[in-house]
Amino acid sequence: MNNSNSTVMIFDENNIWKILFRIAPPVMLAQLIHAMYNIVDSYFVGRYSGDGLTALSVIFPVQLIVTALAVGTGVGVNTLMSRDYARGRVQRANRTAGTGAALAVISWVIFAVLSSLFMHPYVATSAESPQAVEYAVTYGRIVCIGSLGVFLESIWSKVHQAGGNMRLPMLAQISGALTNLLLDPILIFGLGPIPALGVAGAGYATVAGQVVAALITSSALRRPPKLRALSRYARQIYKLGYPSIFMQMLYTVYIMALNMILAGFSDDAVTVLGLYYKLQSFFFIPLNGLQTCIVPILSYNFACLAYDRCKRILYDSCGISLVFMLVGVVSFECIPDRLIGLFSQEPAVLAIGVPAFRVIGLSFIPAVLSLMPPVFFQAIGAAGPSLLLSVVRQICCLIPLSWLFSKTS
């Protein structure tokens, strides 16, 4: 790949802050735009129907499964390519990129089939209102069957980022989000000869935006290797990417479990949880952006045996993230009613959401210290300890405690 030399120049820069401030802003902007997909959908759907807003909250964990598979595979591709660039193996990096695209298509086919079969049984466990169930099944099937764009864009963006190109993924995210923003009100409420599709329209707008983003990043498409070699590359990709997939899957299982617990109280409680996680994705952009950026940098420097630089990159990234997360803490503590009011003015939603947001906002600062270190282990191919910690924290502690408090409080 022609940009391998530029990758070496960027990642060899002595000033770590200069590296981060060069490559992080485009990635953070891309993630900001990505976060806008769900926020924009929730904004317009919330004005269409309260049950529609509940439906989006129920389907949010399903969308996280897509993200876990797509981004986790992309992380494996990104890490493997970064190591190959560090060792001057450009052709091998190209074969890795080709394997990633093939894995994206295979993952999409499997996920689309399974989600279509099990969508209704899942939704029935997380929503009470028949209208909310109907909306959730409709929206969920549209975004899952149409998720090929997510898989391809995630892989191709990581290919570009491994080569030091952070701008094209940013452009793709911006274009996709603008497409979604333009189509959402038109397809939800109708315009001229275009009929109002309601919640289904939000699903179609989301899929259209994702397809546009995938097309823009498609210059990263490479020919996959032959079948035997493809399976070998796939094992290497998933060996590096499975920690990311597994940790995001744990997060998804955690949210699904909370939805099921809260559904026993009211659909409004499920709605509040969905709104929180969508707003959280906005305030966590600096943290998530730095996590994305430091993976190839850490992988490159670790391959070059620059261990002190790896530690310094991790420490500096934690410091930057802590400063940015203070904005989220202040917002959730001081203006929770305004944050929720962007999507819903229903008294029941506000009554549940305002105190909940103030409690949860206190967790933003410690979140940095728990979420950043696992990235280091992932980048160097030693993610076992972080995986164990994630299982204990989310599955063994948080879910049982949530269930217990729901019965006693």
Language-model regions, residue ranges each:
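Transmembrane alpha-helical core residues of multi-pass small-molecule transporters
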Residues: F60-Q63, S107, S175-N180, A205-A213, ...
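Transmembrane helical elements of multi-pass membrane transporters/channels
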Residues: R22-D41, I142, E153, G176, ...
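Short alpha-helical transmembrane segments in multi-pass integral membrane proteins
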Residues: M1-V27, M81-L148, I194-Y242, L298-S363, ...
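N-terminal transmembrane alpha-helices
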Residues: F11-Y43, R47-Y48, L64-G76, L80, ...
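Small-residue hotspots at the loop-to-helix junctions and early N-terminal turns
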Residues: G50-P61, A136, G140, G203, ...
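Helix-terminus/linker motif at the lipid-water interface of multi-pass membrane proteins
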Residues: L32, M36-T54, V123-P130, I186-L197, ...
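Small-residue-rich hydrophobic transmembrane alpha-helices
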Residues: L53-V113, V150-G164, L168-P169, V272-V330, ...
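Helix-loop-helix hairpin linking two adjacent transmembrane segments in secondary transporters
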Residues: I145-G149, E153, S157-Q161, R167-A214
